[in-house]
């Protein structure tokens, strides 16, 4: 966590927000993910993809990284569950230090970052889905 100072006074603490997420593919895994509002899509490691039963991602997509480089990553769909909410979301498979929860998943789940409380909060009411996704 980083403390921001103004004239020697601490005015804010800036840190990363992590969230426990249950991901469902062919198999289900609960994982701690870094919430990244600068990432459009969620990104998981090949090992986590394998644990979800994603042996070969359905698609390959070209993405631009934060440093400007463009690379191809595998892409598939998983069901994300957070705090009683669930929604299908795109997961990219690539080398990451920790799993990333991107904006597409947050929007699908109806969640936003509350920086003051350092957690996710609802952005809208959530309607429970009774049908399947596929």
Regions found by a protein language model. Name each.
Residues 1-134:
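Pepsin/retropepsin-fold aspartyl endopeptidases
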């Amino acid at each position: 966590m980083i403390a921001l100072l103004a004239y020697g006074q601490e005015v804010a603490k800036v840190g990363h927000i992590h969230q426990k997420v249950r991901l469902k593919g062919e198999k289900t895994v609960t994982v701690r993910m870094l919430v990244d509002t600068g990432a459009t899509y969620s990104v998981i490691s090949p090992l986590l993809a394998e644990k979800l039963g994603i042996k070969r991602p359905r698609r390959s997509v070209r993405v631009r990284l934060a440093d400007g480089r463009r690379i191809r990553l595998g892409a598939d769909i998983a069901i994300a569950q957070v705090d009683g909410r669930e929604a299908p979301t795109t997961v990219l498979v690539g080398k990451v230090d920790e799993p990333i929860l991107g904006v597409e998943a947050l929007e699908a789940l109806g969640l936003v970052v509350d920086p003051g409380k350092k957690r996710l909060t609802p952005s809208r009411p959530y309607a429970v889905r009774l049908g399947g996704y596929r």
